[in-house]
Amino acid sequence: MKLSIVTTLYKSEEYVVEFYERASRAAQNLVGNDYEIIFVNDGSPDSSLDKAIHLTHEHDNIIIIDLSRNFGHHKAMMTGLEHSSGDHVFLIDSDLEEKPEWLSSFNEQMTKDSTDMVYGIQDHRKGAFVEKVTGALFYKIFRLLTGVAQPNNIVTARLMSRRYVNALISHKERELNIGGLWIITGFIQSTQVVQKSSSSQTTYNFARKLSHLVNAITSFSSLPLVYTFYTGLLLSFSAFIFIIKLLIQFFFMAKPPDGYTSMIASIWFFSGLVILFLGIQGIYLSKMFIETKNRPYTIIRKIYK
């Protein structure tokens, strides 16, 4: 098998057929009929699965992996990659915001640059002002707290060599962030500037984005724990200096401490920090708890061919 095209389905019913047609044309132009298209149904609540199954009645190059429930975009993608068999794998979203026709230009760049992965980045992030700002903050905070040099505005679409895919799926985290794994897997990678179309509403609201950021950071770095330690050290030192100041004022300047307002404010402030730091440690402990259970990160209900 020369090429595998991997995509996920979630509220994708209006795109499934057109995606298959366009992806098939792109694959045929590149490798003839030696390709497969893998759909991973991530517990989609609409008729995405039914439409994909209908395609299998007419075409024999389709594999559908039906997950038992919604496990999340990243885990669904990894499941699809694990079932791919092509010498090259083209991973892409099925909502047609990312064009299947990019396969050709990605392949040209991969050949020209002799790389193991070519992936797309947007020159301008789509969406409203708030979405653009929160997106930029996500990448900045992620790089700051993990040390992983993830470029801004990456997209799902990417063409990968078989050895790169094998290395990628060797990661066995249960709480995974595939965006970081793409980078730390290594090999020679190159980017291509692309422009996504706006054909659908995003399924990521602010709460999901915040949860994604926390998961991404705590999956790739212990720096938040290091920063917690140094923050505590700094606050302890500051409190010690403040106590010395109060003692000097009391014994040598006959000036008693001021009222309770500043004391209450300080108690609230430090109590908040304590709760925050305990929460950070709790997140890491919960991840360790989940990983030690060694549960599969997805469960497959059925595979259609």
Which residues does each PLM region occupy?
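Short conserved micro-motifs on helix faces and helix-strand junctions that flank
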Residues: 1, 8, 67-69, 158, ...
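Acceptor/aglycone-binding surface of glycosyltransferases and processive sugar-polymer synthases
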Residues: 67-69, 74-83, 100-176, 197-207, ...
